[in-house]
Amino acid sequence: CGPCFTTDPYTESKCATCCGGRGKCVGPQCLCNRI
């Protein structure tokens, strides 16, 4: 998965939903890791 970009307060949750895995947030960029 590529990174998801969001300014949402629930960035990690949105990233996990987008990617179907876990989300790690680094500033405004959320990196998705599939499990």
From Swiss-Prot:
Disulfide bonds join C1-C18, C4-C25, C15-C30, C19-C32. The presence of a 'disulfide through disulfide knot' structurally defines this protein as a knottin. This is Peptide P2. Pfam families: Toxin_5. One of its GO terms (molecular function) is toxin activity. It comes from the Eukaryota. Signal peptide: none annotated. Keywords: Chloride channel impairing toxin, Disulfide bond, Ion channel impairing toxin, Knottin, Secreted, Toxin, Voltage-gated chloride channel impairing toxin. It is found in: Secreted. Belongs to the short scorpion toxin superfamily. Chloride channel inhibitor family. GO terms for cellular component: extracellular region. Expressed by the venom gland. Coiled coil: none annotated. Toxin with unknown function in healthy organisms. On glioma cells, interacts with chloride channels (probably ClC-3/CLCN3) and MMP2 at the surface of glioma cells. This complex is then internalized via caveolae, thus inhibiting the chloride channels necessary for cell shrinkage and tumor propagation. InterPro entries: Scorpion_toxin-like_sf (IPR036574), Scorpion_toxinS_Cl_inh (IPR007958).
